[in-house]
Amino acid sequence: MPAFHATRKRSAWRWLRTLAWSLLYPACVSVVSAEESPQAILAFDNPVQQYGSIARTRLEGWRSLIDAARELTDLEKLQRVNEFFNQVTFVNDIDHWGVEDYWATPTQLLTSNGGDCEDFSIAKYFTLRQMGIPADHLRLTYVKALKLNQAHMVLTYFKTPGVDPLVLDNLVNGIEKASNRDDLLPVYSFNAEGLWLARERGNEQHIGKPERLSRWQEVVARINTEQMP
């Protein structure tokens, strides 16, 4: 992946690699089990009943967004999806779900009208896949948000392999090239087909399949039990 920031410091890379390995290995990952899940998570069999008619309206808007895809270019799809989901309220997992880290499905994000950066990125990824954009053009990308000094997730879009990708970020309404986002330092990225670790000189290392990410597998399993629009 092209570099997000040309000047990477050694100390930053030590921090990032520590973060990356803690996120990649299941032994270091806190996964929500049925026994540990808050009632809010377990009660999602009928989200519209739980959250009311406004939730249904948001889901209908999602359906309309996907239905319009055949008339749109890829860039128009990116712009509309980014704008649509960025209307949702940002809420930390501990406040929203009662757990430290939870990856919500797009349905959960929309019906509850709240989520964090992972939830926004996941929803955009699966929506764009439904709109016909191939998996190898999209990656969920963990970065360090330098201004916030914290881990953050964005969705990146590659028109062709190896080019400077576009960044879809819940903190920024506009879509910019990664090379223009010098506030973001990439750690690793993944999609349904692979997992890549960012390298110091702006390249990347393919390190396996996304099955290594237990939280990803868990959210995909839940999405498969839901009915996408």
Label the model's feature ranges.
Residues 2-5, 31-229:
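A structural boundary/capping signal
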Residues 5-20:
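Bacterial N-terminal signal peptides that target proteins for export
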Residues 24-32:
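Hydrophobic h-region of N-terminal signal peptides that target proteins for export
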